[in-house]
Amino acid sequence: MTLREVSVATDLSDFYDLLVIGAGPAGMAAAVEASASGARVAVLDENPRPGGQIYREITRNSPDRRTYLGPDYWKGQPLAEAFCLSNVDYASRATVWSLETRDKTAGQARNVVGVTVAGSARMVETNAVVLATGAQERPMPVPGWTLPGVMTAGAAQIALKAAGAMPAGPVVLIGCGPLLYLLASQLVDAGVPDLTVLDTAQSPFRGAVLRHMPEFLLSPYVLKGIGLLLKVRRHAQVVYGVRSIAIIGSQHAESVRYAVGQGERSIPAKSVLLHQGVIPSTSLSNAAGCELQWNDEQRAFQPVTDHDGRTTKAGIYVAGDGAGIAGAQAAEVSGRLAALAALADLKLVSTQTSSTSIKSRHAQARRFLRGRAFLDALYTPRQSFLAPSAPETIVCRCEEITVRKLREAIALGPPGPNQLKTFVRCGMGQCQGRLCAATVTEIMVAEERKVSPADVGTYRLRSPVKPVRLAELAHLPHTARALKAVTGRDPVDHDTTETGHIL
């Protein structure tokens, strides 16, 4: 068996038993598990090669980058190799822009997925979809965050993994979370000089943190975490307890002004890397109508799922960080669990086989989840960064909506983010709210004070969840329904050329 690479949309089959969206650890694991049971499987992924964000370019990176990418990165190699040997259709550089469910009827698939590959779009039918779309960085709007030279820590790590590109110094990393220190450690190992970390985390001596410490000390993450912190403190300047940030510059980032203790300080900066944790990527699950719930520990919305990844929509499963932040190893296990659940629901494996495998995978998952609650509590962002207060700070980058404009609109009384769109175009740009949704919810909560994010809610998305060109839609087959919708005549009255154009 070997992977079948799909380079154009027409090479995809009309139907698959299981469609996996995303080729990170969860997506690759789900595909390997399902294909091994004989299911017809396709994987659709935006990246040029498998691996997702955590294992980006794992199939191509050279050993000379092993030093600074670290052992956790190379742990993904066996999974990537298994994926490349699996009997799966794999479409890279594929944009999935639609996921629609329909009532199950005889001879009809439950789900229809809209995807663009190599500039042409098509619809693919499947009875089961595993959403393995991973996580996205939580936005961190601060004054000056739209200046050239400012990017997220995740973007800098992508450049490091994909091309070995280093940020120009002086480099200032700002925020909190494990990824911030992982990137700082990788930059140290890569030889980047003049490195400063401005840690915005709250005090580690809070009750919520201390309560989970005993479990964390028994987790597989404790030694790794201590090692990262010690290395970064040895080789970089680390400032703890940072309460506010402003990035200064006219045409490019030039310095960072920050508040710590009782005063303010300023340091020069040419590259500023922002990060305050990651949150589940829920665009497709949201648009498909899957119920979302608020996770107060992770300060994020996530799909409602059972222990095996089933959502509230039959035939849709969520695996990996898209279901809740848990890390790469837990994501791999959850991908296998979601695939096993889908296979069982489709009756492609026996109940006894799936039950035995699922029980074994749950035992693995519990080990990788141990200590997660401690990390969530330790790196809960400060409210001042979740809901920025500086009036001219831009929240919605697409439409250039500032904190001031948002507050003025919120004062008019909209009950949630969707109604807020009536007053300002926040969330209506090309990213469709992916970069501002979390901040808008937090600002509305901060303004109301006595409500929870669960009460405020988040944007309700519709397909297409990604921008689609008219030329791409023109490549869609002219179905009977489409022809009648456009012309008002029954399909039998039309003559079409081989390319499908209406005559």
UniProtKB/Swiss-Prot annotation:
<protein>
    <recommendedName>
        <fullName>Opine oxidase subunit A</fullName>
        <ecNumber>1.-.-.-</ecNumber>
    </recommendedName>
</protein>
<dbReference type="Pfam" id="PF07992">
    <property type="entry name" value="Pyr_redox_2"/>
</dbReference>
<comment type="pathway">
    <text>Opine metabolism; octopine degradation.</text>
</comment>
<dbReference type="InterPro" id="IPR017224">
    <property type="entry name" value="Opine_Oxase_asu/HCN_bsu"/>
</dbReference>
<dbReference type="GO" id="GO:0016491">
    <property type="term" value="F:oxidoreductase activity"/>
</dbReference>
<dbReference type="InterPro" id="IPR041854">
    <property type="entry name" value="BFD-like_2Fe2S-bd_dom_sf"/>
</dbReference>
<dbReference type="InterPro" id="IPR036188">
    <property type="entry name" value="FAD/NAD-bd_sf"/>
</dbReference>
<keyword id="KW-0614">Plasmid</keyword>
<keyword id="KW-0560">Oxidoreductase</keyword>
<dbReference type="InterPro" id="IPR023753">
    <property type="entry name" value="FAD/NAD-binding_dom"/>
</dbReference>
<dbReference type="Pfam" id="PF17806">
    <property type="entry name" value="SO_alpha_A3"/>
</dbReference>
<dbReference type="InterPro" id="IPR041117">
    <property type="entry name" value="SoxA_A3"/>
</dbReference>
<dbReference type="InterPro" id="IPR051691">
    <property type="entry name" value="Metab_Enz_Cyan_OpOx_G3PDH"/>
</dbReference>
<comment type="similarity">
    <text>To T-protein and to dimethylglycine dehydrogenase.</text>
</comment>
<comment type="function">
    <text>Oxidative cleavage of octopine into L-arginine and pyruvate.</text>
</comment>
<comment type="subunit">
    <text>Heterodimer of a subunit A and a subunit B.</text>
</comment>
